[in-house]
Amino acid sequence: MSRVAIIDFGSQFTQLLARRIRELNVYSEIFPHDIAFDYIKDSKAFILSGGPKSVLDFTGMPPIVHDIIELNKKTSVPVLGVCYGLQLLSNYFNSTIVHGCGQEFGKAILNVVKKSEMIKDVWKVGDQPYVWMSHADSVYDTPCGFEVIACSVVNNAIAMISNEERRIYGVQFHPEVYHTPDGVKLLANFVRIAGCDNNWTVESFLDEQENLIKKQVGDKKVIAALSGGVDSSVAAALTYRAIGDQLHCIFIDNGLLRYNEAEKVRQSFVDQFQMPVTIVDRSSVFLDKLQFVTDPEQKRKIIGKTFIEVFEEEANKIGNVEFLMQGTIYPDVIESGGSVGKESVTIKSHHNVGGLPDIMKLQLVEPLKLLFKDEVRLLGKKLGISDEILMRHPFPGPGLAIRIIGEITQEKVNMLQAADEIYINLIKKYNLYDVIWQAFAVLLPVKTVGVMGDSRTYGYTCALRAVTSSDGMTAECFPFGVDLETKIIFYEFLQDVSNTIVNNVQGINRVVYDTTSKPPATIEWE
């Protein structure tokens, strides 16, 4: 399978660049700029990403750029520089880079002045297409051996260059963002120029990964901590398809999960897939250790430590286990700095099993570590996993422990589980679940006076949270950013959910809605 290697110089859009290439059914992979070149020199094409640094600040060209250009000199392997990547290429080929002069942020209009294979069937000479810019430095003059393909209408700054003979291209704008309408078409031209195979599909990944799991594991036993979330569920289904009963899934009920979670996991995996899952109820153990604890970080540590103790105890009952399966996905690998070819590789562990590979001396099986979240969901569909699991909202590792503000008791857990179940079910009834990125209820350590019938009540306050987001890094309170009709429906929904919770959950007599964005707040309360 041919690969487009994306060299990451720190752009916030690097993952998006990889996704756009994969949407063209071409396999792309992100590598840090300090990777050993031998690991990637067999790539079909190279893309130099954008980044926050300035070419004017370093004293020498990054070695990876020199290696790629030298390879191109011998083989004409295609190279594309995006934003900072363009400036790196231009600097390498003796162009002048200037700061401040020609800077642009946001929407921009180009003048197309020359033909290029990069713009074939997309733009023609004389066109003035919209693109999206985000740069303070600019390329002042044409690099040696290159031609200018497009300039900015506003300041005539160089926006696109090409060396057709050597198949080296550079763009000052970001083709990977949706604000550049023709960006994907330009990237499609680049992979066409490179002669990349269009065979990166969920089906091809499934077949290949199944064989890789069989080869890695052989006849040995594999254990997995099943959480009921998207990633661990898809990873477990794929691994079970590959090795069958050699996989031993353990689901630990810590008493802080969503309502009836253990039963839902049993129905999904035991009933649907006939996959053996050991369901271990240790609710009392976790709740006992959390008694009188109010600090959220202390809660997390206690839950993490107790989880490892329980998981290790259950794993030892199986015996002779050599592998641990984890639902690590590609963004986890990238964000933790892990990549092939680096001197030290740190893989982000599952929130509850961090440290287990070292403690139990297990080898890792990570069947999803090359997939983005949307690809994981597509794979899950191919494996027959229900939308009930695949489209679930994110749920924190410590569970309801960080949604019960203050001390945790069984009574509070019961109240919050009931309130949250009502909230989520009504969200689905109003057809809002798929347009909300994450929604949940929070139990506050605040009691207020209320009236029910002719009696005075003194009960807890429940806060509702619902946000829209693309990646969880930033978030807006729902229903900002949606149409007026949805907003009207949402206000009707809030009245409905408030009344339903207060009338059906004993101990809660007031419901409030959290309207804070991230930043300044975080999505979770603790």
UniProtKB/Swiss-Prot annotation:
<dbReference type="GO" id="GO:0003921">
    <property type="term" value="F:GMP synthase activity"/>
</dbReference>
<dbReference type="InterPro" id="IPR029062">
    <property type="entry name" value="Class_I_gatase-like"/>
</dbReference>
<dbReference type="InterPro" id="IPR017926">
    <property type="entry name" value="GATASE"/>
</dbReference>
<keyword id="KW-0658">Purine biosynthesis</keyword>
<keyword id="KW-0315">Glutamine amidotransferase</keyword>
<dbReference type="InterPro" id="IPR022310">
    <property type="entry name" value="NAD/GMP_synthase"/>
</dbReference>
<feature type="domain" description="Glutamine amidotransferase type-1">
    <location>
        <begin position="3"/>
        <end position="199"/>
    </location>
</feature>
<dbReference type="Pfam" id="PF00958">
    <property type="entry name" value="GMP_synt_C"/>
</dbReference>
<keyword id="KW-0436">Ligase</keyword>
<keyword id="KW-0067">ATP-binding</keyword>
<keyword id="KW-0547">Nucleotide-binding</keyword>
<dbReference type="InterPro" id="IPR004739">
    <property type="entry name" value="GMP_synth_GATase"/>
</dbReference>
<dbReference type="InterPro" id="IPR001674">
    <property type="entry name" value="GMP_synth_C"/>
</dbReference>
<feature type="domain" description="GMPS ATP-PPase">
    <location>
        <begin position="200"/>
        <end position="392"/>
    </location>
</feature>
<feature type="active site">
    <location>
        <position position="174"/>
    </location>
</feature>
<dbReference type="GO" id="GO:0005524">
    <property type="term" value="F:ATP binding"/>
</dbReference>
<dbReference type="InterPro" id="IPR014729">
    <property type="entry name" value="Rossmann-like_a/b/a_fold"/>
</dbReference>
<keyword id="KW-0332">GMP biosynthesis</keyword>
<dbReference type="InterPro" id="IPR025777">
    <property type="entry name" value="GMPS_ATP_PPase_dom"/>
</dbReference>
<comment type="subunit">
    <text>Homodimer.</text>
</comment>
<dbReference type="InterPro" id="IPR022955">
    <property type="entry name" value="GMP_synthase"/>
</dbReference>
<dbReference type="Pfam" id="PF00117">
    <property type="entry name" value="GATase"/>
</dbReference>
<feature type="active site" description="Nucleophile">
    <location>
        <position position="83"/>
    </location>
</feature>
<feature type="binding site">
    <location>
        <begin position="227"/>
        <end position="233"/>
    </location>
    <ligand>
        <name>ATP</name>
    </ligand>
</feature>
<dbReference type="Pfam" id="PF02540">
    <property type="entry name" value="NAD_synthase"/>
</dbReference>
<comment type="function">
    <text>Catalyzes the synthesis of GMP from XMP.</text>
</comment>
<dbReference type="GO" id="GO:0005829">
    <property type="term" value="C:cytosol"/>
</dbReference>
<protein>
    <recommendedName>
        <fullName>GMP synthase [glutamine-hydrolyzing]</fullName>
        <ecNumber>6.3.5.2</ecNumber>
    </recommendedName>
</protein>
<feature type="active site">
    <location>
        <position position="176"/>
    </location>
</feature>
<comment type="pathway">
    <text>Purine metabolism; GMP biosynthesis; GMP from XMP (L-Gln route): step 1/1.</text>
</comment>
